[in-house]
Amino acid sequence: MTNKVRFVPGNTEVEVQTGENLLNIAASAGVYIHAFCGGDGVCGKCKVQIEQGAVVSDRTMKLSRADFEAGYRLACRSRVEADVVVRIPDQIRRDGKALKQKPKTTRAITARTLEALVGTWDVSPPVEKRYLELPPPTIDDNVADMRRLSRAISAGCHDCKEPTYDHPELLRDLPFLLRKADWKVTVILLRGKRVEEPDRIIGLEPGNTTSKFYGLAVDIGTTTVCGVLIDLNSGKIMAEASAYNAQIGYGEDVISRIVYAQRPGGLKALQEKVVYTLNNVIETICKKVGINAADITYIMSAGNTTMEHLLVGLDPKFLREAPYVPICSQFPLTRAAAIGIQAHPSVRLFLYPSPASYVGGDIVSGVHACQLHKSAALTLFIDIGTNGEIVIGNQEWLVCAACSAGPAFEGGGIKHGMRASTGAIEKFHIHPDTYEPMVVTVGLAKPRGICGSGLISIVAELLEAGAIDQRGKFNRQLDSPRIRDGADGYEYVIVWAKDSVLGEDIVLTEVDLDNLMRAKGAMYAGYVTLLESVGMTFADLDRVVLAGNFGAYIDLEQAISIGLLPDIDRGRFFYLGNASLLGCQISLTDHHRFRERVEVFKLMTHMELSENPHFMGHYMAALFLPHTDMSLFPSVRAKLAG
């Protein structure tokens, strides 16, 4: 159910889901409300007046009885339950004009948008469960047990090839299981990789277990491991869970982990940690649904090249040494139990292929999900992160590259940077006269630090307000106690110590700004260099797809303002969220789409940006906000001029 919210003065109107938080709504709509406790309810500054309609909100000590009866509420403590008109008390500037509202950026992935990108898929998984009642052997029919099983599987299918089998454990257990089950069994079949290949018997269970048929899609991230359980009979998502990758204790980025893997016992420790994390995700999911891990029939996974190597116990040593070569690009089918994963003993682990050392299976999975290999639309596919990955192309060709953006987007190298967890500042607006902030945190909790989306938001707002210049330097002439000379040079105080969890001021420093500009500069230089390598520019693009959880939370206008994304028609941008996980879900459910994985991989040509002589020039040009060439950012130039 949706409701309309109109903010006055300014008459900014948005449509929102019933129950959404009013402070979050205002921040997403570009409406400034004075608030600096992150939405924790302790500063009392986000006072608004409900002129029409109603919100659900309790009176707090920050509101007098008279104010409450007059319709005043704290935005951070109010949920929209009907159409409302909200008056913001401090919306008048010193010149008497109402504050100009920012363009609203819609980030939600609607079902229609998702279908336009990824299409539809069937519920016809690559693994099949089939219940069989076999005739017991007799003197007249005393064929081998495996022959009897294969014959029953092929019965009624004239064109089918007799299924194969691939592991001795199956033969060892087969005669005892068949007889104990009175010849009534459920066979688990893996469809042939190609239409002409026979199916493969990978498991056998006593009785009829076809109702318990589950698959697990997994994104093995450097920071987080995410899993989705799917009922393979219906295609329905049953549960989701995620956990921090326990490898973090050995290093926060892939380079640190590759280095650690070279220590005695390091590779084994890293593999055990990622398997431990995956097992925790499986355990959480199974508890939610009320099933056993043994009910999971197969696992489809993707991750960057380092994570995929470590998961199956392959040494990633040569990924970081020129000429940056992985051990393999297409990983062999692996029995999950053999590497310690808790699932059915017959479960196979499928991994998406990785084109290069720093362009992994997670990107192939994302490209596969949004069907670049089937679309005539020329697409720029971006996964923003420490190791920014880029793909350009369509159904005829695909080129891919990675650019080392550094950890700024994930909180690394930022004085008060952190991952996007509770208390992280994720949205920010600034008053153009007083330079006082509007701060919204993840979970509307007391501020703890700044996550990647918050960093982009803060820098974009400071730039537009004139608090920093295009070199990323603070305007030292401004009359504001929040801009000061700190221990690491000039800085802006986002949250005072008394309002933060840390008990110290949360600040953004000029060093932080430098690190952000290097990160966004590397990404932008990557787009331009890769486009140039195929003789194209941003004008040739039909669409830009932002993948990854981070991409789903950044504000489009603010990302363009700092030069992280190109200044092109906003209608060409699409948000896909965790595309890697989505690709795994599709392959898990539809065997036709499953078979396309390798086609996508083979279509992708990798380019090494570090070897391109033009990359460094584009990188240096992008070390400005938004860029040294403002003609590339006409909308930002107009905002900064006006």
Which residues does each predicted region cover?
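Nucleotide/phosphate-binding catalytic cleft detector across ATP-hydrolyzing
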Residues: 64-69, 74-217, 222, 234, ...
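N-terminal phosphate-binding loop and adjacent alpha-helix
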Residues: 246-287, 413, 424-429, 515-518, ...
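Local cysteine-cluster metal-coordination motifs and their immediate loop/turn environment
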Residues: 32-58, 65-82
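Short glycine-rich phosphate-binding loop at a beta-alpha junction
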Residues: 293-304, 459, 538-548
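Catalytic phosphate/nucleotide-handling subdomain of diverse soluble enzymes
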Residues: 394-396, 536-600
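A contiguous, well-structured pocket-lining segment that forms one wall/lid of small-molecule binding clefts
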Residues: 463-533
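Short glycine/threonine-rich loop-to-helix capping motif typified by GTGT followed
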Residues: 304-318, 536-539, 548-567, 609-618, ...
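Glycine-rich phosphate-binding loop of actin/hexokinase-like ATP-binding domains
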Residues: 218-222, 227-253, 317-333, 365, ...
